[in-house]
């Protein structure tokens, strides 16, 4: 048995080859070539082989279309097999597809609608609306495959992106145009945290957000959409702040492997054409890798470590390198990271970690204390927490906060066994301040106001630094712990303390 010879190329090389084969309009625009027709020759799950006439072979990464009774099925060219045959990845189910069906070459990669018309809408991997609210009347479409911005276009300055969330801005600040890993199990407030970030970015920076559900549960996507409508992040009658792109768990691997690029393309438009600071959420980046692994095996590539695709680092790099800051605007990415069997050395999370600028860890232990957002102040890290980037005062305050919380953590066993009375006076003071800091790191969210009844607070970075500095200096040692819980800045603490005192009298 003679196996066909595979010409597996990296996506970057394929894109360059496609550019040689297909005339381009502009830097990232494609001019559609004359449509050529082919026939389905084999269907192997999510992989479809298509044969064309001599001299009409479509370029790698081109989109092909098949008209089916259910609608249009889009295929993406992955390999040239020889004998005028291409191997393609299906973006939808291939059930009912038979040999001999007609296939047309679009002459360009998959393109999706971009612009403000996408805000408040839910779209799939090929840019079709799936929210039953009619077509998206976008004036422009962009291909999902693109090169990262050139070095001369990129901004090299390390700049903090203010989120208005105290614990993040103080202890694990986000880089403008950076990549943040969001670690959190079920029920620790990940969705609310994401919604608040979307809300705050819109308020503080006037920017938009793109939420990309990669291989997530359909129920979770539905819940997120409903919650966003309830909290006003999505406004069906007026301006919305977010576009939703979903490729759920039940989708074929081709859709799950490409849906992250669809979301990124929409975000890139807001950055490059409108000069916006865009927030891109990817939930879950592991599913992107997992889908690539499924597709790779079907394409006949020899698996590497733990069964992952041999192109794992390349695939991840092509996605992550497009998430960056340019001189026009930025795309800041928050990526939920699933760690298989809690093994951080697994190739999928290990490859992701190489690209991250900051990690935000949501802790079940902290959420059980009723402290929200349940961000672990000792486990969450950022490369921006450096005196040269954030300034000496910010760095000193953040370091002292972490040292105080760490000292409290190490004293907890002694307190549990012997009680507070056995501690030295200095340790007692440390514990009291640490407990106040712990509560002060909580914050009422605007998107949770409908549930808690507490108005949300967006706290500026300079106010956060000065507030925590005052607590560390002992200026508010006389105030009760409860006054520090679920408030914004230090003026809110004083007001709450006065209110508590008045109620007590």
Swiss-Prot record:
Its main location: mitochondrion. GO terms for cellular component: mitochondrial inner membrane; proton-transporting ATP synthase complex. Keywords: ATP synthesis, ATP-binding, CF(1), Hydrogen ion transport, Ion transport, Membrane, Mitochondrion, Mitochondrion inner membrane, Nucleotide-binding, Transit peptide, Translocase, Transport. PROSITE patterns: ATPASE_ALPHA_BETA. SUPFAM superfamilies: C-terminal domain of alpha and beta subunits of F1 ATP synthase (SSF47917), N-terminal domain of alpha and beta subunits of F1 ATP synthase (SSF50615), P-loop containing nucleoside triphosphate hydrolases (SSF52540). The keyword Transport applies. ATP binds at residues 184-191. GO terms for molecular function: ATP binding; ATP hydrolysis activity; proton-transporting ATP synthase activity, rotational mechanism. GO terms for biological process: proton motive force-driven mitochondrial ATP synthesis. It catalyses: ATP + H2O + 4 H(+)(in) = ADP + phosphate + 5 H(+)(out). It is an enzyme of class 7 (translocase). It is found in: Mitochondrion; Mitochondrion inner membrane. Its EC number is 7.1.2.2. Mitochondrial membrane ATP synthase (F(1)F(0) ATP synthase or Complex V) produces ATP from ADP in the presence of a proton gradient across the membrane which is generated by electron transport complexes of the respiratory chain. F-type ATPases consist of two structural domains, F(1) - containing the extramembraneous catalytic core, and F(0) - containing the membrane proton channel, linked together by a central stalk and a peripheral stalk. During catalysis, ATP synthesis in the catalytic domain of F(1) is coupled via a rotary mechanism of the central stalk subunits to proton translocation. F-type ATPases have 2 components, CF(1) - the catalytic core - and CF(0) - the membrane proton channel. CF(1) has five subunits: alpha(3), beta(3), gamma(1), delta(1), epsilon(1). CF(0) has three main subunits: a, b and c. Belongs to the ATPase alpha/beta chains family. This is ATP synthase subunit beta, mitochondrial.
